[in-house]
Amino acid sequence: MYKRQIITNAHKIIQGEHPDLSRKDSDCFFFQRLQEKDATQLMLDLVKTRLPNAYGYSPMEDIQVITPSRKGSMGVIELNQQLQAVLNPKSVDKPECRSILYTFREGDKVMQIKNNYDIIWHKDGENGTGIFNGDIGYLRAINRQGQEVIAEFDGRRATYPFEQLDQLELAYAVTVHKSQGSEFQAVVMPLLGGFPKLYYRNLLYTAVTRARRLLILIGSQNVIYQMVDNNRRMNRYTCLRDMLEQQKPTQTLPISQSDEPDGEIKDTQKQEESL
């Protein structure tokens, strides 16, 4: 019987237990790939061909690659360029424009990376303002003569002059941080050795819970287990609280009720045969 292992593994992770990566009857896959080139190639094959063929998912709309970091060979900048090359390849029929980081072309999947409260959008004869940090959409047109692009976010079309292209990034791959608050039918996450400070339990939990129907982890099982074991964020706040306790003055001073402190710091599968 098909098992909802995403939910089970999410509970395990947040409780500090290692997730079950071996089930063959679940919605959570793990592929061991210890070389970056092998992990990247599998990711590209899954997003472009294997998941669409097996589940009918749209590579653009349903599948999201999520990764811990921006930089490095497994970071969003590099992965976006590779995913763009296979999902929206260069063509004489597709106009392009350039930002500092990326070459954009018509049809690209993009993300707004800073709040823009003033930009005007149009949808079904209605007008409004505001495209916000984390919104994901698509480039519908690039007007090189007019030096502007049209991006569509959930039916809202907004025009960006070229000088505002720094507000957009390719979004075939996004960081875990940028994925917060969103859900996707399928999540593909490469996890190999990278930046140790970024590999911790809450980050893995956040990534896993972005997946509605299907989660695929690619890389090293040891890295995944190390993330679960690394409760760095919780420890950071615990250490801060202990440090503040130690620095409390020994002399008791009279204070008014309005001056009282709040008192507590709060921290707001190996299944390749079926794919």
Which residues does each predicted region cover?
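Intrinsically disordered, low-complexity sequence elements enriched in Ser/Thr/Gly/Pro
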Residues: 2, 31, 230-234
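Conserved helicase motor core of P-loop NTPases
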Residues: 3-130
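C-terminal accessory regions
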Residues: 133-275
